[in-house]
Curated annotation (Swiss-Prot):
InterPro entries: NSP3_N_rotavirus (IPR042519), NSP3_sf (IPR036082), Rotavirus_NSP3 (IPR002873). Plays an important role in stimulating the translation of viral mRNAs. These mRNAs are capped but not polyadenylated, instead terminating in a conserved sequence 'GACC' at the 3' that is recognized by NSP3, which competes with host PABPC1 for EIF4G1 binding. The interaction between NSP3 and host EIF4G1 stabilizes the EIF4E-EIF4G1 interaction, thereby facilitating the initiation of capped mRNA translation. It is found in: Host cytoplasm. The lineage of its organism: Viruses, Riboviria, Orthornavirae, Duplornaviricota, Resentoviricetes. It comes from Rotavirus A (strain RVA/Human/Indonesia/69M/1980/G8P4[10]). This is Non-structural protein 3.
Length: 313
């Protein structure tokens, strides 16, 4: 036999099961869509939204209220359920109406239309006056019933706050805002002027650097021209030296083999690169000195074999 708050406990269990079903539906939908998710985050978000919608829409309180009425009837307190006799006549009709009302409440709550807005819309409506910009606010039957039941209160603190707002010294407020605006304007102008000065200095430094670079580039060009001229002069001088040596060589009474060997060495001199040309000249001079040294040794040996003595003068 059901006792005490068994119906309320079953309703609470059904609501909790609905929440778990909502979490499973959300996670399975994300998996089908191929979206990665954090289960704890989804659970927390769904719980927060579920609790908000169930509480704000009044569905939870509606279900728990009916369950409490049934529990009171089961516990022999039939008098407490008399106020619900209008909807207890047909349970099927009542179930369909409750389901539709709960769906509408959940839909409105999920769209951001909270309980305060729904109650105010149900208690008041606005009547437009033709030909005028003003309108008349009318109370509905629900508002009348709330007044009769003593469910309407006047917030004195709100009235006093409203009166204070109406007595604001707008002139002083405007002057304060004007001073703040002028101060802000001055700071902005100072920052702008400082930025302009800094930008001008940067431009001057940039132009100065460009001038220095231009001067250095001109100097580099001059050095390059001088270097090219010097290189051409050296190449010409090397060619002249080689020609002079070849002419002088032909005037000597040396054998043709010796002349040919020396000419080959002269022709091997690099006349394009002066550095290489100097190395080639050094090699030729070393060879000539070496040949002269061998000739002197041979001549010295002949003198000694002939019992002659040589001296340097």
């Amino acid at each position: 036999m059901l006792k005490m708050e068994s119906t309320q406990q079953m309703v609470s269990s059904i609501i909790n099961s609905s929440f778990e079903a909502a979490v499973v539906a959300a996670t399975s939908t994300l998996e089908l869509m191929g979206i990665q998710y954090d289960y704890n985050e989804v659970y927390t978000r769904v719980k927060s939204k579920f609790d908000l919608v169930m509480d704000d829409s009044g569905v939870k309180n509606n279900l728990m209220g009916k369950a409490a009425t049934i529990d009171q009837a089961l516990n022999g307190k039939f008098s407490s359920s008399i106020r619900n006799r209008n909807w207890m006549t047909d349970s099927k009709t009542d179930a369909r109406l409750d389901e539709d009302v709960n769906k509408l409440r959940l839909l409105l709550s999920s769209k951001g239309i909270d309980q305060k807005m729904r109650v105010l819309n149900a208690c008041f409506n606005v009547k437009r006056i033709p030909g005028k910009s003003s309108s008349v606010i009318r109370c509905t039957r629900l508002m009348k019933e709330k007044i009769e039941r003593g469910e309407v209160e006047v917030d004195d603190a709100f009235v006093e706050e409203k009166m204070e707002v109406d007595t604001i010294d707008w002139k002083s407020r405007y002057e304060q805002l004007e001073k703040r605006f002028e101060s802000l304007k001055q700071r902005v102008n100072e920052k702008y002027n400082n930025w302009v000065i800094k930008a001008r200095k940067d431009n001057e430094n940039m132009y100065s650097l460009q001038n220095v670079i231009s001067q250095q580039q001109a100097h580099i060009n001059e050095l390059q021209i001088y270097n090219n001229k010097l290189e051409r002069d050296l190449q010409s001088k090397i060619g002249s030296v080689i020609s002079s040596i070849e002419w002088y060589l032909r005037s000597m009474e040396l054998s043709d083999d010796i002349k040919s060997d020396i000419e080959q060495q002269l022709n091997s001199i690099d006349q394009i690169n002066p550095v290489n040309a100097y190395d080639d000249f050094e090699s030729i001079l070393r060879n000539l000195i070496s040949d002269y040294d061998r000739m002197f040794i041979m001549f010295k040996g002949l003198l000694q074999q002939s019992n002659y003595i040589y001296t340097y003068e």
